[in-house]
């Protein structure tokens, strides 16, 4: 019985960890949008954005390994100059 209880507790910790990762992704996403609006006016696909966001993206990927795929998808559109990067939003 004790072993089953321990396994159950470990499962709960993993779930809590995942929800913390999701909230940190949400915060990081807001930061990336803010950086994008600060650098607006540089035209579509501004290469300078890649340098400014690079360190932040690296930190997000290391800190939230569970959802790396989601981070790459969301950040990829910002770094490659998606439609959101044309002028100020």
Swiss-Prot record:
Please, which domain of life does this record's source organism belong to?
A: Eukaryota
Q: Which InterPro entries match?
A: HssA/B-related
* Residue ranges of the TM segments: none
UniProt xrefs under Pfam families: Coiled
Write out the similarity annotation. Belongs to the hssA/B family.
Tell me what this protein is called.
HssA/B-like protein 21
What is the source species?
Answer: Dictyostelium discoideum
